[in-house]
Amino acid sequence: MSYLVPMVVEQTNRGERSYDIYSRLLKDRIIFLGSGIDDTVANLVIAQLLFLEAEDPDKDISLYINSPGGSITAGMAIYDTLQYIRPDVSTICVGLAASMGAFLLAAGKKGKRYALPNAEIMIHQPAGGTQGQATDIEIHARRIMNMKESLNKILAERTGQPLERIQKDTDRDYFMTAQEAKEYGIIDEVISHPKKTSKK
């Protein structure tokens, strides 16, 4: 199913210029992650982050998230890039940040992680399904357990929660309101109006 991407027209000293809405947002250092996370989506987000860093390494970037989650490896590629680049990245949950979406929400610069009042956040353990020979299934099971351990450690570090609590809470789907996510440490503030972006 394809969606029509709105175009916006801007007046410049050279006349009119039209942009698709995402390109126009990018001009204001805003990246919108509004879908499930797979390799294609991750590559687009990473490319935008690297482009904005090259444009101005000292100016904040805003990453808006409305995502049900997705691939762990794709999400971790975004996470590593968020930590790698020099600009502070502010994360803002609009709608839903679930699974890897919640993980990326927590990955923003501490003090600059937000959610709108009616946003919903959900954390849980990695899921995976594999078929084949028993030894291959065992290899994949070990890999998923290693990923689970790694994700839990990072989430504990990002939220300030004890690792034991993260392990318990992610054992099943754990839903939170925006306020509960603030108390948990996934975000720093529930906001109703835009925050002013700043230099570092």
UniProtKB/Swiss-Prot annotation:
The yes or no answer to whether the keyword Protease is present is yes
**Catalyses which reaction(s):** Hydrolysis of proteins to small peptides in the presence of ATP and magnesium. alpha-casein is the usual test substrate. In the absence of ATP, only oligopeptides shorter than five residues are hydrolyzed (such as succinyl-Leu-Tyr-|-NHMec, and Leu-Tyr-Leu-|-Tyr-Trp, in which cleavage of the -Tyr-|-Leu- and -Tyr-|-Trp bonds also occurs)
**Top-tier EC class:** hydrolase
Please provide, alphabetically and separated by semicolons, the GO molecular function terms listed in this UniProt record.
Answer: ATP-dependent peptidase activity; ATPase binding; serine-type endopeptidase activity
Gene Ontology CC: one annotated term? cytoplasm
Active site residues according to the UniProt entry = 99, 124
What biological process terms from GO does the record include? protein quality control for misfolded or incompletely synthesized proteins
Keywords, comma-separated and alphabetical: Cytoplasm, Hydrolase, Protease, Serine protease
Q: Which domain of life is it from?
A: Bacteria
Q: Which SUPFAM superfamilies match?
A: ClpP/crotonase
- Where located? Cytoplasm
Q: Mind telling me which HAMAP family this protein's record contains?
A: ClpP
Q: Which family does it belong to?
A: Belongs to the peptidase S14 family.
Its assembly, as annotated, is: Fourteen ClpP subunits assemble into 2 heptameric rings which stack back to back to give a disk-like structure with a central cavity, resembling the structure of eukaryotic proteasomes.
Q: What does this protein's UniProt record list under function?
A: Cleaves peptides in various proteins in a process that requires ATP hydrolysis. Has a chymotrypsin-like activity. Plays a major role in the degradation of misfolded proteins.
Name recorded for this polypeptide: ATP-dependent Clp protease proteolytic subunit
Native organism: Syntrophomonas wolfei subsp. wolfei (strain DSM 2245B / Goettingen)
The organism's lineage is:
Bacteria, Bacillati, Bacillota, Clostridia, Eubacteriales
